[in-house]
Curated annotation (Swiss-Prot):
PANTHER family: BIFUNCTIONAL PROTEIN [INCLUDES 2-HYDROXYACYL-COA DEHYDRATASE (N-TER) AND ITS ACTIVATOR DOMAIN (C_TERM), BIFUNCTIONAL PROTEIN [INCLUDES 2-HYDROXYACYL-COA DEHYDRATASE (N-TER) AND ITS ACTIVATOR DOMAIN (C_TERM)-RELATED. Homodimer. GO terms for molecular function: enzyme activator activity; hydrolase activity; iron-sulfur cluster binding; metal ion binding. InterPro entries: ATPase_BadF (IPR002731), ATPase_NBD (IPR043129), CoA_E_activase_dom (IPR008275), Dehydratase_Activator_Redct (IPR051805). This is (R)-phenyllactate dehydratase activator. [4Fe-4S] cluster binds at C128, C167. NCBIfam families: CoA_E_activ. Its cofactor is [4Fe-4S] cluster. Involved in the fermentation of L-phenylalanine via a Stickland reaction. Required for the activation of the (R)-phenyllactate dehydratase complex FldABC. Only in the oxidized state, FldI exhibits significant ATPase activity, which appears to be essential for unidirectional electron transfer. This protein is extremely sensitive towards oxygen. Its EC number is 3.6.1.-. It comes from Clostridium sporogenes. It comes from the Bacteria.
Amino acid sequence: MADIYTMGVDIGSTASKTVVLKNGKEIVSQAVISVGAGTSGPKRAIDSVLKDAKLSIEDLDYIVSTGYGRNSFDFANKQISELSCHAKGVYFDNNKARTVIDIGGQDIKVLKLADSGRLLNFIMNDKCAAGTGRFLDVMSRVIEVPVDELGKKALESKNPCTISSTCTVFAESEVISQLARGVKTEDLIAGICKSVASRVASLAKRSGIEELVVMSGGVAKNIGVVKAMEAELGRDIYISKNSQLNGALGASLYAYESFQKERS
């Protein structure tokens, strides 16, 4: 019997992610490109996974797109919401997951999962950039520390400062003022991470926390935010190895299920 190859394409606001699965369970290739919808990112991510998997797009049996820019991808057989795809991808990685906190480039989502992995309900904030990946990108530029180094730097802090502004624009001004006063960079970064964690934890508490708590999305790679989140919630947080790829993984899993249904 021939192998079945499916691809999930997660086109976010700030990054493009792809996962190719073989027979609905084996990850053959994956890619993350740090530009999202409306850019060359999706095409580059797709080209990358196909090259790694030694496949052409014609070799794929089914493709599902998800994310902010899911409707912009013409080759998809189906589009599925990122909420469902994140839930599916996280549960595939760890079937003990019951609460999923996903911090994206422009929004924050908290998902509640059933024991079966089905998405029960969700709460999200997409009205303000504060607490999102975009917020961290802005702060990274202001303090001149690469965004992927923020987490490690935050752990060096002995005296985290307080960022009181909840608006990105005002928080940026506040950080600039604190820099001018000579506040240590690591203390500022720790304060920034704590500010993100506080905002996200507030949303998560409104949803209700049930263990296991899993953090998904690119911000999950920021150890400073993760540690601050654990302190805010008073419990450990599980981070999957490929946290930024959970949406694309879920989309590829849905692609496999859809192909099987349509074939039967």
